[in-house]
Amino acid sequence: CRLLPSGIGRDLAKQTWKRKEAIEGRTHIIYITCSKWLQGEAKQSALIGQNTIECIPNPIDTNVFRMVDKAEARRKLGLPADKRLVLFASQRVTNHNKGMNYLVDACRKMAEQHPEMLENTAVVVLGGHAEDLREQFNLPMFPLGYVSDTQKIVDVYNAIDVFVTPSLSDNLPNTVMEAMACGVPCVGFKVGGIPEMIDHERNGYVVKMKDSTDLATGIHWVLNVADYEMLSAEAVEKVKQCYSQAQVAAQYIAVYEKALANSKTKEV
């Protein structure tokens, strides 16, 4: 982990590892990760790599995160009705790991290649310190600040046309799941579990890592080239089939049934 110290001397991670290693019966533990990427990382662990590791995604409430009227959502948020809106969201948008600089560069490149986007496209930034970024964008920018109200977040997703997540590291981001549930195509770097969520050129666009040119291509493709209605419908369907509460609950039930069956076999 890049956040851990060099390993010289004593550190909390090493002490925690030793305590976990000493747990009796740990070889019978079934581990669950929420992404295939994390499952692959776990399989390389000297501590749990020989255990059963299942992959079950986190669920989303599709009765809450769903499509609503776009025009009404924009009216409630004070966003323009005559522009295509690109959303970036983070708890703290100035966090370098969230890749805001790549989106800024991508917007600059889009405006250079497609000057009409200066008039018909804008960026919406959701999260703390959003106002600090206004001067960085050449496209019009609307900072919404930090929002905690769930219904307002649903309105934000429904108000925009594409959600962009240029994170440099991530697992299975809820923001992508929430946007897709609201019928919003997503564009994101090929990192962590993001490519598991975004099916390239089917419900969004998977971008080459740290490539602002490809990021610009992906955003422009979603807004101007692709069959937008198809992308939107595919995004909603992906969430229903993979991330709905009913689907995830069924997977957990299957794991518990498997664990109980194995336990009874060992008792016999």
What is each PLM-predicted segment?
Residues 114-121, 127-154, 162:
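Nucleotide-activated donor-binding/catalytic signature segment of Leloir-type glycosyltransferases, i.e.
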Residues 200-201, 205-212, 221-226:
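Conserved acidic donor-binding segment of nucleotide-sugar-dependent glycosyltransferases
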Residues 227-242, 251-254:
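A short, well-ordered alpha-helix in the C-terminal region of glycosyltransferases
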Residues 168:
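Aromatic "clamp/platform" in nucleotide-sugar-dependent glycosyltransferases that forms part
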Residues 9-55, 60-64, 70:
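A short, active-site helix/loop in glycosyltransferases that binds the activated sugar's phosphate group
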Residues 66-79:
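A short helix/loop element that forms part of the nucleotide-sugar donor recognition site in Leloir-type
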Residues 185-188, 198:
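Short hydrophobic beta-strand element within catalytic cores of glycosyltransferases
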Residues 80-98, 104-107:
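Conserved donor-binding/catalytic core segment of Leloir-type glycosyltransferases
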